[in-house]
Amino acid sequence: QGKYMYTLGIDIGSTTSKCVILEDGRTIVAKSLVKAGTGTSGPDGAYNEVLHSAGLTQDEIAFTMATGYGRKTYPAADAEMSELSCHGKGVFFMEPECRTIIDIGGQDAKVILLSSNGTISNFVMNDKCAAGTGRFLDVMAGILQLDISELEQYAAKSEHPCSISSTCTVFAESEVISQLSNNVDLSDLVAGICSS
């Protein structure tokens, strides 16, 4: 392994921590995701997991870049970069033809437009309330006693998605509870939540 240069990226979000290791800046050799974000053991867990998965030690990592909500708090990082810039660079690296990125995070939602050379040409962001964020979906999954990862499979089975008219998480929560008491099919309810 000594003939390669390894770099590590860590995204420390509000609800999850993700890592990736690149070999010579081109090949993904390992990645990890831990469902715990900034202010928890999540970043260290993701970091240690990705090193273990790659069969590497911290000393073999030439450079570590941090991004995300907790990017300024991670001591193992050599540098930090905004999520917007990292999204642009990462998507352009993986899918150079892609021009639109949609990021539904735990605290905010972003839509990013890329130019043909991979630079950000424009973006919009909602960080004022939970509507349209991962937190909204997390709250709805909790009401339904589902894991957030199960929402997609339930929504895909829906034949008649119900209407959730509230975009506010608090009001949508009341609406979902009401739909449950009316025995609305779970798949139709989840599809309605995902479409709201």
Task: Give the location of each predicted region.
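Gly/Thr-rich phosphate-binding beta-strand-loop-beta motif of the actin/hexokinase/Hsp70
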Residues: 4-25, 99-118
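Short glycine-rich, Thr/Ser-proximal phosphate-binding strand/loop in the N-terminal lobe
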Residues: 9-45, 49, 120, 127-128
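Short beta-strand-loop/turn "lid" adjacent to the catalytic site in phosphate-handling enzymes
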Residues: 30-36, 54-85, 112, 118-121
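Active-site nucleophile and cofactor-binding loops and adjacent substrate-binding regions
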Residues: 34-37, 78-88, 102-106, 124-132, ...
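Glycine-rich phosphate-binding loop plus the immediately following alpha-helix
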Residues: 121-156, 160
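Adenine-nucleotide phosphate-binding core of ATP-dependent small-molecule kinases
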Residues: 174-196
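Internal, active-site/partner-interface "lid" segment
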Residues: 147-179
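Short acidic, glycine/serine/threonine-rich loops at helix termini
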Residues: 21-23, 73-78, 111-117, 123-125, ...
